[in-house]
């Protein structure tokens, strides 16, 4: 029996009824997987594995496959009726295709990514450090203009969805400076942030790429009710920073710190 939080119940219902924004933007997986919980479970868990493998390719280090054990990934493993892991895996695959120069494939993949989750094209562009992949926001804009439904899943949820800034402030009040929520779930990957502060990271987009990835990860918390599973979309970029600046012998330690992190938290 898998967990079905409110978001999951929305996705399961989307093939037969309209749902509210932003969930109605994420229509591809609900259309294809429909109400089949087993199919959702397979899709999400295969995506978690793929994220580890793709990050290893992206960074050039097999040790960075350990990102699959970050708390955001393990939370989705146990709550698989979600679009996040498939979206992240797709964003990373799109970036890798773009980095190979196969734009004839990368651009259609970016467009498909925009139907999985509205943030997928943004993260594809960050991972590849190339703005062309933002073309994937076109289907997001088209879908945004289409009719959406109301939210009736909980008594208070409709108001939270209608007023996202209020929701973000409500759920993060007094928690912005909590290191157990905002920092320690990264484990050894936090070295990527230290590198950015030192200004010595010179791979791909360099410190600017790390900064943009962190901004794209943390700023949505202003309008979100979750934390870790949102900002850890930046994991591949921080992993790349670690591989770039740390000595080779330190990478297994980073991987072990991720897998056995005692301050990982629940991952939400």
Annotate the PLM regions.
Residues 125-202, 210-214:
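Membrane-lumen/periplasm interface segments of specific transmembrane helices
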Residues 86-109, 237-241:
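Specific aromatic-rich, kink-prone transmembrane helix
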Residues 83, 183-247:
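Membrane-water interface signatures at transmembrane helix termini and the short loops
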Residues 27, 41, 45-53, 62-89, ...:
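Aromatic- and kink-enriched transmembrane "portal" helix at the membrane-lumen/periplasm boundary
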Residues 92-95, 104-128, 218:
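Membrane-interface alpha helices of multi-pass inner-membrane proteins
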Residues 1-12, 19-32, 117, 153-154:
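Extracytoplasmic catalytic/substrate-binding loops of multi-pass membrane glycan-assembly enzymes
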Residues 12-31, 43-47, 179-186:
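Membrane-proximal lumenal/periplasmic loop motifs of glycosylation machinery
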Residues 131-140, 247-262:
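Signature aromatic-anchored transmembrane alpha helix within multi-pass, membrane-resident enzymes
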């Amino acid at each position: 029996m898998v967990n079905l939080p409110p978001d999951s119940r929305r996705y399961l219902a989307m093939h037969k009824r309209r749902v509210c924004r932003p969930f109605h933007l994420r229509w591809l997986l609900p259309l294809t997987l429909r109400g089949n919980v087993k199919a959702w479970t397979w899709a999400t868990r295969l995506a978690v594995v793929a994220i580890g493998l793709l990050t290893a390719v992206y960074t050039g280090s097999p040790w960075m496959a350990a990102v699959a054990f970050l708390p955001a990934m393990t939370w989705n493993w146990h709550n698989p009726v979600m679009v996040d892991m498939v979206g992240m895996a797709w964003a990373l695959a799109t970036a890798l295709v773009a980095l190979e120069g196969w734009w004839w494939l990368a651009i259609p993949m970016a467009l498909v990514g925009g139907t999985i989750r509205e943030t997928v094209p943004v993260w594809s562009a960050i991972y590849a450090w190339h703005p062309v992949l933002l073309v994937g926001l076109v289907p997001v804009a088209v879908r945004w203009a289409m009719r959406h439904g109301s939210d009736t899943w909980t008594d208070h949820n409709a108001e939270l969805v209608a007023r996202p800034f209020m929701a973000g402030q409500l759920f993060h009040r007094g928690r912005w400076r909590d290191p157990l929520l905002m920092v320690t779930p990264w484990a050894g990957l936090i070295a990527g942030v230290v590198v950015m502060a030192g200004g010595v990271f010179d791979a791909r987009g360099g410190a600017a790429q790390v900064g943009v990835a962190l901004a794209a990860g943390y700023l949505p918390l202003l309008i979100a009710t979750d934390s870790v599973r949102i900002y850890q979309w930046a994991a591949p970029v921080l992993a790349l920073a670690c591989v770039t600046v740390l000595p080779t012998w330190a990478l297994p330690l980073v991987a072990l710190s991720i897998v056995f992190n005692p301050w990982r938290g629940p991952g939400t």
